[in-house]
From Swiss-Prot:
Transmembrane segments: none
Protein name per Swiss-Prot or TrEMBL: tRNA dimethylallyltransferase
Keyword tRNA processing tagged: yes
Gene: miaA
Assembly and oligomerization: Monomer.
Catalyzed reactions per annotation: adenosine(37) in tRNA + dimethylallyl diphosphate = N(6)-dimethylallyladenosine(37) in tRNA + diphosphate
Cofactor needs: Mg(2+)
Site (Interaction with substrate tRNA): S106, R127
Length: 310
């Protein structure tokens, strides 16, 4: 069910990975008596900390955070489930008279939470067959199949994202309609919703991504992946396909050198960030503010206030 409309706004901070969303979300939560709701598909997994840039507890400024560390790496997590979890958290936060501040890099998850979005059904037999084909043929082959039946969906889904490719093919098969026909409509489920985007130029973002990946490896990312593999990461239908974790797993099995794993992580993150930016830029409801604007927080607060006055 969609959140019940009330006077409290729903605020979402959006933008590409490494753009500065986390810092702005904390600043807004402090100014708006808010609580953070994670919308990153991978930060829900316990132990996936370094590779997802999950904010340590000590750096959360005492602000309550929701939908972090709720699943094991073996647990699957669908967009429909995430929508249900997040909307429940939003309703509880608003019920306490506080402001939910959503932040995370998963554009589809954010849209599914904020917009009117009813999910098509599932067929476990079809899903299992497609997942077996994914394991046997690889994501590139299934992506080509998707391109043949739903070209628009293929342009929106990364070749590496086998999980979403499988879901798109499943929806096409069981509904007879393009997967894109089931994507969220651009209509908020609750009218008191506002999106603030962190605008950052590509050269600066690319440099930040390199710095972030280097910091991940320096902070013990390889050891994190090694530990999670022992906990079943490779068998995880969702967590097992996370950027960086796949590449390091390939290093640990001897398929890649450490330098290759690092470089592939940088490249995959850059591609992902471009796709994120493209998704969010298509939404005219997002108010974009430069990452280096001295009045970033004040301007964002003003955007929220304007929504309340509207």
């Amino acid at each position: 069910m969609a959140p019940t409309p009330n006077r409290t706004p729903i605020v979402a901070v959006v933008g590409a990975t490494a753009s500065g969303k986390t810092g702005l979300s904390l600043d807004l939560a402090e100014r708006l008596r808010g609580e953070i709701v994670n919308t990153d598909a991978m930060q829900v997994y316990r132990g996936m900390d370094i590779g997802t840039a999950k904010l340590p507890v000590a750096e959360r400024r005492g602000i309550p955070h929701h939908l972090l560390d709720t699943l094991t790496v073996r647990d699957p997590a669908t967009v429909a489930e995430f929508q249900s979890w997040a909307r429940a958290e939003i309703a509880e936060i608003r019920g306490r008279g506080r402001t939910p501040v959503l932040v995370g890099g998963s554009a589809l998850y954010t849209r599914a939470i904020l917009d009117r979005f009813e999910f098509p059904g599932t067929d476990e037999a079809v899903r299992r067959r497609l997942e077996a084909e994914l394991d046997a043929l690889g994501p590139a082959a299934l992506h080509e199949r998707l391109r043949a039946v739903d070209p628009e969906a293929a342009t929106r889904i990364l070749v590496e994202n086998g999980r979403r490719i499988v879901r798109a093919l499943e929806v096409v098969e069981i509904t007879g309609r393009p997967f894109t026909a089931s994507l969220p409509t651009m209509e908020y489920a609750d009218p008191r919703t506002v999106q603030v985007g962190v605008d950052i130029d590509r050269p600066t973002l690319d440099a930040r991504i390199v710095a972030r990946v280097d910091a991940m490896f320096a902070a013990g990312f390889v050891e994190e992946v090694e530990r999670l593999l022992a906990e079943g990461l490779a068998e995880g239908r969702t967590a097992g396909r996370a950027i960086g974790y796949r590449e390091v797993a390939s290093y640990l099995t001897g398929e890649l050198s450490l330098a290759e794993a690092r470089e592939r992580t940088v490249s995959a993150t850059r591609r992902f960030s471009r796709r994120q930016d493209s998704w969010f830029r298509k939404d005219p409801r997002v108010t974009w503010i430069r990452y280096d604007d001295p009045g970033l927080v004040d301007r964002a607060v003003s955007v929220v206030a304007a929504t309340l006055d509207g």
